[in-house]
Swiss-Prot record:
This is Translation initiation factor 2 subunit beta. It comes from Natronomonas pharaonis (strain ATCC 35678 / DSM 2160 / CIP 103997 / JCM 8858 / NBRC 14720 / NCIMB 2260 / Gabara) (Halobacterium pharaonis). Keywords: Initiation factor, Protein biosynthesis. Residues 1-32 are annotated as: Disordered. eIF-2 functions in the early steps of protein synthesis by forming a ternary complex with GTP and initiator tRNA. NCBIfam families: PRK03988.1. The keyword Protein biosynthesis applies.
Amino acid sequence: MGYEEQLDRALEETPDIEGTAARFSVPDPDVRQEGNATVYENFQPTIDRLDREESHVMKFLQNELGTSANIDERGRLRLTGEFRQARVEEAINDYVEGYVICPECGLPDTRLEKENGAEVLRCEACGARSPAGN
């Protein structure tokens, strides 16, 4: 059996590897209106999945949505103003893209670090270092 035949056979027998999307997914934001505030009910499970500090994600959402926010006694994020679920989801997806997913290998196995006062995304999978938030 020649090299090409062996390679073809190996590729046929190798199981397909699921993409990163199947391995990493963020819960859809569960938001509802409560007076003049939007309450992000499942903020804590989202933070747990992102493996980031709640204050960092909250600050990003405040800047992205142009509002103020606080975390209530039940761990829910309360955003001042009315925001649709789709808008909050878009902001969370922007956060994931800039502060969670490695731009080099596309995996979520990253840590946020400070280097010379700047936030850097360090990938534990491929070792890449890149500016966070890009």
